[in-house]
């Protein structure tokens, strides 16, 4: 598996060309003089029902797993007891630069070192992506590693830890799932370690909450302009945002769906994400008002949400 680092310039139409850069970090609703020509172009390409690759404009499962582990601090560690029964207990954990879980345990582990660490990340009450790390649990190798892992724990939790209570899970493979009751994708250890967590991970939730609170008109407009729909949208909310785009939850009389809308180009920080959103909002408004043509490919893939605790209207909020 190759990590996804390329731009989508070859796959998408030209990216937004702002006459004047947007300096503000707030989300704005731009309204232009319809008599003035515009040069802004935003691209939304049709996605395919395939694993996460460049064609789906989504991060690879390895990247998603790394982001989940970076954002989370608690999980369920399952090991085999001395009598052979599986036992799962809640644990706190940190991760090192390669994504290796670092645990603090007050008990000795089973002679059978096989273990699984299951971690979930709720996204704005609408979706719960998760990953399960399979590997061998054991003590760090030497004093140098111990000191480094102690520093990792201290940075994560702001507290000192007894070095003799530190354990690590040597990652063998990772099962990544987008939500409850969905099929997972296995990620190789090398892909997981070489992947980078999403650059927006620490700010994504705040951005999404701002949009859902203040830009609902824009989100409805995105559904109508950028997505090829043949039904009326009753309600919609943004689920999550990453460097390649964002996911929307759409409620309708026909059912509940998730849809992926890509950014015109990859973003790497808060300013880039908000500028891209504002540019897409402006273009959608002008297309809706017939001030410019819808000169882009609409998203055609909608993923129906079934059997999820988050699928009811309002997302449990």
Curated annotation (Swiss-Prot):
It is found in: Plastid, Chloroplast stroma. Keywords: Chlorophyll biosynthesis, Chloroplast, Heme biosynthesis, Plastid, Transit peptide. The keyword Ribonucleoprotein does not apply. InterPro entries: DUF2470 (IPR019595), Haem_oxidase_HugZ-like_sf (IPR037119), Split_barrel_FMN-bd (IPR012349). One of its GO terms (cellular component) is chloroplast. Transmembrane segments: none annotated. The keyword Chloroplast applies. GO terms for biological process: chlorophyll biosynthetic process; heme biosynthetic process; photosynthetic electron transport chain; positive regulation of heme biosynthetic process; post-embryonic development; tetrapyrrole biosynthetic process. Residues 1-42 form a transit peptide. SUPFAM superfamilies: FMN-binding split barrel. GO terms for molecular function: protein-membrane adaptor activity. Disruption phenotype: Reduced growth, slightly pale green leaves, reduced levels of chlorophyll and heme, and low non-photochemical quenching (NPQ). Interacts with HEMA1 and forms a heterotetramer of two GLUTRBP and two HEMA1 subunits. Involved in the regulation of glutamyl-tRNA reductase (GluTR) which is important for the synthesis and distribution of 5-aminolevulinate, a precursor in heme and chlorophyll biosynthesis. Stimulates GluTR activity and regulates glutamate-1-semialdehyde release. May play a role in heme metabolism. Necessary for efficient photosynthetic electron transport in chloroplasts. This is Glutamyl-tRNA reductase-binding protein, chloroplastic. It comes from Arabidopsis thaliana (Mouse-ear cress).
